[in-house]
Amino acid sequence: YPGICRNLSSAERDERIAVGTPHALRLKMDKAIAATGPLIWHDAEAGPQHARPAIFGDVVLARKETPSSYHLAVTVDDYLQGVTLVTRGQDLFEASHVHRLLQALLGYNSPAYNHHKLLTDSQGNRLAKRDKAQTLQSLRAVGYTPAEVRALAGW
């Protein structure tokens, strides 16, 4: 995000919103980091991690059509549910830097994390529903054993 609307006045923001201009609520990353200072989170595989949320720039917290971003939603949801161990795929490892920052800003304790390997096909593409990849059920249907499925995950 190049910061085009970062320093609009309240009046300018209100005017743009009133006429239906698409808009987003962003976290001013530099101010957020200054407010929390250095942060650490712990991953079961990778060990202690120094949070580097600045790699994302001013992250979106909400949009006109989406009342809450993934980052904000999972941070609040995990807290409200009392989650103490967050288990997600390795593809979401970097997002944890932002989540740790949001936890600190909201006064939440940081849960432990475990970012697991992803199941991939023979070409190394992850098995994802959105890509219409094979499902575990389809792998079982063609005869994959539990041990073979674990081998796909690198275990």
Task: Give a label for each model feature.
Residues 141-155:
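Extended, charge-rich low-complexity interaction segments
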Residues 1-128, 135-140:
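Active-site cores that bind ATP or allylic diphosphates and position pyrophosphate for catalysis
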